[in-house]
């Protein structure tokens, strides 16, 4: 357990908040921002429930976020404290560390980001980096991200980095690119139809000690998608093909093989009534940080 002084941290944040308010007057010098989320659990013995001993009577999940923006530039830092993690969260989170930070520049058609990357390709069947504090999930990449819109209706994305695994970054490399074209706006600008096609490629290069020598170190994923909407009707789908990797079968045996994901959906959104239908099929369809199969959160 690291020696974090949380009360001192709260005082520092309060002082910083006052500084932020003072800086609001000087908008030409940029804009500071900050947030503090702190969650606490207090635990005690309960003979009726059979809880005879409590290892940690107090636990906290605390997150301090600081940001600064100036014209087209944005910068951010996030400091996490799990002293220790609250019950229900993996003990792998224990500790306190400055885990995430980023620098970002946004232009008219181009966005560049270095540091912590949160991104999603398509519907997120294979590639989605996100933070869900309530569930103890954060699989952000530490690397780089490019978003480019060379023409109206055309979007290209590129990501590269190493994924976060609890309080460390895994010795794994993730590379990916995604492209989408809005054919509706390009071919039928006056029709009001949305017709977009897209696809992406994601590669995971597992260089960790968790890598199983019987499995390929490199896992490749290819996907295509289609979205169509007109008036009250919408439909679409996405298909993902995955190269060979380890996975659990229905009997919890470790298998090795290719995978695929299929997502189809349709909907009607009329005044006073709505209808939607979704079909999903998954076969070895997830992409984990590494070949360690015993933790669902990574």
Task: Write out the residue ranges for each language-model feature.
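N-terminal secretory signal peptides that target proteins for export/translocation
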Residues: 1-4
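Bacterial N-terminal signal peptides
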Residues: 7-18
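Signature for the C-terminal beta-barrel architecture of outer-membrane proteins
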Residues: 24-32, 37, 41-60, 69-75, ...
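Phosphate/ribose-recognition catalytic cores of enzymes acting on nucleotide-derived substrates
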Residues: 100
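Conserved, mostly hydrophobic/aromatic
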Residues: 114
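Extended assembly-interface regions of large multimeric machines
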Residues: 118-120
């Amino acid at each position: 357990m690291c020696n974090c002084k949380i009360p001192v941290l709260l005082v520092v944040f309060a002082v910083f908040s006052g500084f932020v308010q003072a800086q609001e007057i000087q908008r030409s010098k940029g804009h500071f921002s900050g947030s503090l989320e702190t969650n606490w659990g207090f635990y005690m013995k309960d003979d009726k429930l059979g809880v005879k001993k409590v290892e940690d009577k107090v636990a906290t999940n605390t997150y301090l976020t600081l940001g600064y923006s100036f014209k087209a530039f944005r910068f951010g830092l996030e400091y996490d404290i799990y002293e220790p993690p609250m019950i229900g969260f993996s003990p792998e989170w224990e500790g306190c560390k400055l885990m995430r930070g980023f620098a970002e520049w946004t232009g008219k058609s181009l966005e560049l980001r270095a540091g912590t990357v949160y991104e999603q390709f398509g519907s997120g069947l294979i590639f989605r980096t996100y933070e869900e504090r309530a569930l103890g999930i954060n699989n952000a990449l530490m690397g780089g991200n490019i978003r480019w819109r060379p023409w109206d209706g055309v979007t290209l994305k590129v990501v590269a980095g190493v994924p976060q695994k609890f309080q460390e970054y895994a010795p794994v490399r993730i590379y990916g690119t995604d492209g989408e074209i809005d054919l509706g706006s390009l071919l039928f600008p006056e029709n009001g139809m949305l017709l977009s096609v897209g696809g992406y490629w994601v590669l995971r290069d597992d260089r960790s000690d968790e890598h199983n020598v019987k499995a390929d170190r490199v896992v490749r994923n290819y996907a295509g998608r289609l979205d169509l909407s007109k008036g009250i009707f919408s439909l679409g789908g996405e298909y993902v093909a995955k190269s060979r990797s380890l996975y659990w079968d229905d009997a919890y045996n470790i298998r090795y093989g290719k995978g695929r994901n299929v997502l189809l959906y349709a909907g009607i959104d009329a005044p006073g009534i709505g209808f939607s239908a979704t079909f999903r099929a998954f076969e070895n369809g997830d992409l984990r940080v590494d070949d360690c199969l015993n933790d669902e959160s990574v």
